[in-house]
């Protein structure tokens, strides 16, 4: 008798769910909201004047447990300046076939050059397209930015860039006159 009642209870759950409204996710036509702190695709950031934040130190590659990042640094010159410091990341690659999305590379970056966006659609039908080169990782230039290579802001030091004292127009006025903010 108990087995019979168990099966009736199971059928009751089934019949009850038959009359509930079905919830269908219409993805990819209507993608849902993404969590604000979601770790998606990586992005190489820029300073407000357009220079790259990456200094080619390779700490992100050392921190990556999956060995998914390859960085080759090069020296900046006065004629060809890509970042405010001595060096820049000449070659930067992230292999998304290996990346596990742990974020250790983000924590290792001393200049906050590498961050993760909310972009989660990384699927592709070609394996070679999942190895992102520097041109696909760099943040897009904003209208007020100047495309590198170009000299750093007049009178600015590496420290000014790191502290955020450089804008698209140049070094902030409070820093030029020696005032503290």
UniProtKB/Swiss-Prot annotation:
An MF annotation (GO) of this entry: iron ion binding
Cofactor(s) for this UniProt protein: [4Fe-4S] cluster
Binding site for [4Fe-4S] cluster 2: 64, 99, 102, 105
Keyword Membrane: yes
Listed EC numbers: 7.1.1.-
Positions annotated to bind [4Fe-4S] cluster 1: 54, 57, 60, 109
Gene Ontology BP annotations: aerobic respiration
Membrane disposition: Peripheral membrane protein
Catalysed reactions listed for this entry: a quinone + NADH + 5 H(+)(in) = a quinol + NAD(+) + 4 H(+)(out)
UniProt cross-references to Gene3D superfamilies, sorted A to Z: 3.30.70.3270
Coiled coil: none
Compartments where found: Cell membrane
Occurrences of domain 4Fe-4S ferredoxin-type (ranges): 44-74, 90-119
Keyword tRNA processing: no
Signal peptide start and end residues: none
EC class of the enzyme, as a word: translocase
GO cellular component terms given for this protein: plasma membrane
Key words, A-Z: 4Fe-4S, Cell membrane, Iron, Iron-sulfur, Membrane, Metal-binding, NAD, Quinone, Repeat, Translocase
Family: Belongs to the complex I 23 kDa subunit family.
Protein purpose: NDH-1 shuttles electrons from NADH, via FMN and iron-sulfur (Fe-S) centers, to quinones in the respiratory chain. The immediate electron acceptor for the enzyme in this species is believed to be menaquinone. Couples the redox reaction to proton translocation (for every two electrons transferred, four hydrogen ions are translocated across the cytoplasmic membrane), and thus conserves the redox energy in a proton gradient.
Assembly information from the UniProt record: NDH-1 is composed of 14 different subunits. Subunits NuoA, H, J, K, L, M, N constitute the membrane sector of the complex.
Full protein name: NADH-quinone oxidoreductase subunit I
Upper lineage: Bacteria, Bacillati, Actinomycetota, Actinomycetes, Mycobacteriales
GN (gene name): nuoI
